[in-house]
């Protein structure tokens, strides 16, 4: 909400507004001549889209979706899917199935939607991970996770049972005292239960399970770099090692 509510934008129906916006974008791209549109949120009267697509192709639409309605919208309109929350390979597979089912119902090719994912990971040996997990920015991983999701892994959320994840992150509201209280309550085990961790080879094996679940564009993000320059300096090399191992494991996938 930090990009909407402080500036007076209505955030009460974000999914409905988003869907109408995507429909309108597609309409403008696919129409010739003036466009009239009477929607719940947007209205166009004799609007023109005179910029021609580059080489005859419109830009691909990528949607970051995790909830049921957004997954449905992804299947109807998106060219690529980049979820903001899929914490196990099984969860990823189930959500991808919803996207593809929606695409089929819309008469689209479900296999044409590219499944991607950034996998937040912690790459290092046990001693490194012990130190990394004490860093405030690493603990902040849990701010991205809804309380309901964390509860599935057997943990209560440090921000309380009503925490919704990304949409509740508003620096203007979260006081220094609230963040310090959050950091003091973070359990390292809660983070480790959520994200791939261990050696580059161990992380690669976990990411491989996501590829087996349908992931086709994996991106390994080593969050250990957030623990300070000591770890940031070697983070890229660790990711490269994990990606090289992943290439060996996935073969022709």
Language-model features, listed with the residues they occupy:
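Well-ordered beta-strand positions
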Residues: 27, 79-80
């Amino acid at each position: 909400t930090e990009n909407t509510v402080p500036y007076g934008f209505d955030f009460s129906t974000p999914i409905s507004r988003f869907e109408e916006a995507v429909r309108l974008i597609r309409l403008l791209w696919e129409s010739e001549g003036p466009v009239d549109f009477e929607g719940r949120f947007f209205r166009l009267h004799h609007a023109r889209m005179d910029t021609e697509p580059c080489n005859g192709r419109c830009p691909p639409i990528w949607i970051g979706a995790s909830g049921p309605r957004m997954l449905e919208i992804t299947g109807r309109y998106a060219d690529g899917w980049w979820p903001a929350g899929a914490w196990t390979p099984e969860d990823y597979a189930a959500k991808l199935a919803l996207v593809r089912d929606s695409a089929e119902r819309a008469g689209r090719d479900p296999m044409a939607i590219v499944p991607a994912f950034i996998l937040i990971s912690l790459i290092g040996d046990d001693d490194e991970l012990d130190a990394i997990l004490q860093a405030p920015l690493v603990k902040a991983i849990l701010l991205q996770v809804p309380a309901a999701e964390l509860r599935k892994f057997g943990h209560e959320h440090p921000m309380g049972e009503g925490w919704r994840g990304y949409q509740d992150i508003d620096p203007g509201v979260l006081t220094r005292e609230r963040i310090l209280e959050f950091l003091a309550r973070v359990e390292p085990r809660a983070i480790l239960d959520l994200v791939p961790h261990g050696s580059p080879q161990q992380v690669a094996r976990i990411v491989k399970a996501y590829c087996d679940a349908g992931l086709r564009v994996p991106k390994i993000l080593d969050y250990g770099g957030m623990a300070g320059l000591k770890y940031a300096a070697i983070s890229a090399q660790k990711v490269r090692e994990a990606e090289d191992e992943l290439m060996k494991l996935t073969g022709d996938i």
